[in-house]
């Protein structure tokens, strides 16, 4: 009879969630394996058993952040309107950031000094940009957007979305400004700037 698994996927997810919280709220100095284990009510042995050490934990954290983000983007079914699909991707981008703010900083900043993800993890992270590029390609292909390099259009759209979400999560919005109404309009305005006239 095999021994029961004591360090399961649920514990792994709790450790990754807490590691992301520590990094995003207290910085890299707060993330020790001992503290992480204590915060999740487990042992450092469990952390080593699941991840092998801090470098692998950080890589797994980066991978998990992009996996969740990518899963949310991939869950959007395509419609026959690629521009509307782009708007919807932008809305999911914000929803994902608000659902997992502890991962947003891990994904899009240098919160972990001297961290370089593994080549496989980095490639998986880059794949999350593909739904936007693909929808831009559809919009260019059907004549809704001007003929321009797809990655340039996608970068401009991402910049709007990323900038507003970063301002919101970092608490840098002007007092009293409600982001939700401005957010979708900003994405639409950027998309309209690429429309074929």
Question: Over which residues does each language-model region extend?
Answer:
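N-terminal intrinsically disordered/low-complexity leader segments
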Residues: 1-10
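Hydrophobic alpha-helical connector segments
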Residues: 74-103, 153-157
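Short secondary-structure transition hinges
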Residues: 95, 99-134, 173-176
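Amphipathic alpha-helical packing segments from all-alpha helical-bundle domains
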Residues: 116-142, 151-155, 180-184, 188, ...
